[in-house]
Swiss-Prot record:
The keyword Transmembrane does not apply. Gene3D superfamilies: FAD/NAD(P)-binding domain, GidA associated domain, C-terminal subdomain. It is found in: Cytoplasm. SUPFAM superfamilies: FAD/NAD(P)-binding domain (SSF51905). Homodimer. Heterotetramer of two MnmE and two MnmG subunits. PROSITE patterns: GIDA_1 (PS01280), GIDA_2 (PS01281). The gene is mnmG. NAD-binding protein involved in the addition of a carboxymethylaminomethyl (cmnm) group at the wobble position (U34) of certain tRNAs, forming tRNA-cmnm(5)s(2)U34. It comes from Mycoplasma mobile (strain ATCC 43663 / 163K / NCTC 11711). One of its GO terms (molecular function) is flavin adenine dinucleotide binding. It holds the Pfam family GIDA. Its cofactor is FAD. This is tRNA uridine 5-carboxymethylaminomethyl modification enzyme MnmG. NAD(+) binds at residues 271-285. One of its GO terms (biological process) is tRNA methylation.
């Protein structure tokens, strides 16, 4: 009997891996999902939360493209809130505390119930290729598994080490297995690897915390949820708590700074800029008297608290001193000590914007192995890699999201155009067109891509189209309805002339609900009307950039033949091989003069071809 050949093998069962597997199975491809531990699918070894600034919008985008993170987050959330409500709509985003145990359990159940996903608990030793094309993987228990495509989503498990003080040992997150052989296999295939570092804070037993010494964050009931297509509301909000480091905490850290794995030189990997360890914060910001520490429940039982803000690589004895110096933690009992973890990642400049390898056909990469941090960034990449693997199997063009379309598009463009030397975290400030990339419009702006990729059901498509039609018709209706000067509203709002309802609600002091009533998409209607001028300006800017994106660069372009290119520009262009003039213009070290020379060369080439 012939051995089974999979349509796709997904290596790694983290947030990227499960998204890739689910979207491929949704498109009726047979998938092998290989995980070191099936009981830790999409585990949360760091913060037990989904969302946050920019990141919450990525989760909404995943939902809009047919992915699963939003749906699963809604099933396992224990607290949810909208962030930045006092600011403009461009920066608002949802964040939810997640029951991390339930999250993994419901994903495992969903995988097991999906007929065309084979969940295999194993370790991949080697990537097999034939004629620079993926052909299979060699595993520890199952030997050779053949495949047409593969997606590597190995997270922080490649040649990973846990570090505390002078202690250093080979391990994956939370004491899981590490994979050394896969790193070696990638090196043999010619991939350049990066060495990165991240970390996680201690966990404390809740019954050992003195909650009378900390501030309780009490949130009102909420009807928020992540998923656009599957509504589930939270019945009860579980509370988080706020406290601060003390002067004593800072002194303990400074007195023992050389014992930190990071400051002793033991850690060689580069850590995340936007999620520093507590010792890094205290060394860098010596004038700051205290730093925020949040107690966040890891499950609905709330018996263990994640100590957000106390990430460290100090030895255990110093951690004990640090913990007990913080208000509320004088008698704390530690469930798990903090640690740093160092691991291999690939240089993402080796990838196309589809997340396919430039050198090995049908081999894709997604998640933290691409140099990112965060569950949301990983899931977004996993979804896109899965979609593009499916399109490759269908002999169709890859789906490449633009910077003006989505945060996922910004993320992938940054990775594949600029690369990264540290764990990349998505920030609102990274998006030039953030007013277009809002929390409330992910479904509408990504609908055309979901239709192309065939990742939504007919019902989901109809839901989004109905929403768009309803908003469009309401705006037209408001534009054509006028308030006469004798109307009570005219007197209430001091209107001297007949005014359209659209003009009236464009004024920020007006209660829009008074005018339109219980309109189901009030926030999006308000934003579209009140920020119409700003939105049009960003659309115009995006359109100008799109013109450059439409100027394609030949894949076989010989940059050595382009005259007057700066040496650095020539090197970068040869290495990155941008697909368009727009992408080339965003490469670090490429200046406008280089772009002009490139365009001049292409124009000359076109003329010569025509003659």
């Amino acid at each position: 009997m012939a051995a089974k050949i999979y349509d796709a093998i997904v290596i790694g069962g983290g947030h990227a891996g499960v998204e890739a597997a689910f979207i491929l199975s949704k498109k009726n491809f047979n998938v092998a999902l290989i995980s070191l531990n099936q009981n830790r699918l999409a585990s949360m070894p760091c913060n037990p939360s989904i969302g946050g600034p920019a990141k919450g919008i990525i989760t909404r985008e995943i939902d809009a493209l047919g992915g699963k993170q939003a749906y699963f987050a809604d099933q396992a959330m224990i607290q949810i809130k909208m962030l930045n409500t006092s600011k403009g709509p461009a920066v608002r985003a949802i964040r939810a505390q997640i029951d991390k145990e339930k999250y993994s359990q419901i994903i495992l159940k969903a995988v097991q119930e999906t007929k065309n996903i084979d969940l295999i608990e194993d370790m991949v030793f080697e990537i097999q290729t034939k004629d620079n094309k993926i052909s299979g993987v060699i595993t520890e228990k199952n030997g050779l598994l053949e495949t047409k495509t593969a997606i590597i989503t190995a997270g922080t498990y490649l040649d990973s080490y846990i570090l505390r003080g002078e202690e250093k040992y080979s391990s994956g997150p939370d004491g899981e297995k590490t994979s050394n052989s896969l790193s070696n296999s990638l090196i043999k295939l010619g991939f350049k690897l990066l060495r990165l570092k991240t970390g996680t804070p201690p966990r404390i037993y809740a019954n050992s915390i003195d909650f009378s010494e900390v501030e309780e964050e009490i949130l009102p009931e909420s009807n928020l949820n992540f998923s656009i297509y599957h509504s589930k509301k939270l019945s009860k909000q579980i509370h988080c708590y706020l406290t601060y480091t003390s002067e004593k905490t800072h002194q303990i850290i400074l007195d023992n700074i050389n014992k930190s794995s990071m400051y002793s030189g033991l850690i060689k990997g580069i850590g995340p800029r936007y999620c520093p360890s507590v010792e890094d914060k205290i060394v860098r910001f010596k004038d700051k008297e205290r730093h925020q520490i949040f107690f966040e429940p890891e499950t609905i039982k709330a018996d263990i608290m994640y100590i957000n803000g106390l990430s460290t690589s100090m030895p255990i004895d110093v951690q004990d001193q640090m913990i007990k110096s913080i208000n509320g933690l004088k008698n704390a009992k530690v469930a798990k000590y903090a640690y740093a973890i160092e691991y291999d990642a690939i240089d993402p400049l080796q990838l196309k914007k589809s997340l396919e390898s430039k050198e090995i056909e049908n081999l894709f990469f997604a998640g933290q192995i691409n140099g990112t941090s965060g569950y949301e960034e990983a899931a977004g990449q996993g979804l896109l890699a899965g979609i593009n693997a499916s399109l490759k199997l269908e002999n169709r063009e890859a789906l490449n999201l633009k910077r003006s379309d989505s945060y996922i598009g910004v993320l992938i463009d940054d990775l594949t155009t600029k690369g990264t030397k540290e764990p990349y975290r998505m920030l609102t400030s990274r998006a030039e067109y953030r007013l277009l990339l809002r929390n409330d419009n992910a479904d509408i702006r990504l609908l055309k891509y979901a239709k192309y990729a065939k990742t939504l059901t007919d019902k989901e498509i109809a839901t989004t189209e109905a929403k768009y039609d309803l908003i469009t018709k309401k705006i037209a209706e408001l534009e054509n309805q006028y308030i006469s000067i004798n109307d009570p509203l005219a007197k209430k709002y001091n209107l001297a002339n007949s005014t359209s309802f659209l003009q009236l609600i464009s004024r920020h002091e007006i209660d829009i609900k008074e005018i339109v009533g219980n309109f189901p998409f009030l926030e999006e209607l308000s934003t579209n009307v009140r920020l119409d001028g700003y939105i049009k300006k960003q659309l115009s800017q995006a359109d100008k950039m799109l013109r450059l994106e439409n100027l394609k660069l030949p894949e076989d372009l010989n940059y050595d033949n382009v005259v007057n290119l700066a040496f650095e520009a020539r090197q970068k262009l040869k290495m990155i091989k941008p697909l368009t003039i727009g992408q080339a213009s965003r490469i670090s070290g490429i200046n406008p003069a280089d772009i002009q020379m490139l365009m001049f060369h292409l124009n000359l080439k076109v003329v010569k071809n025509e003659n």
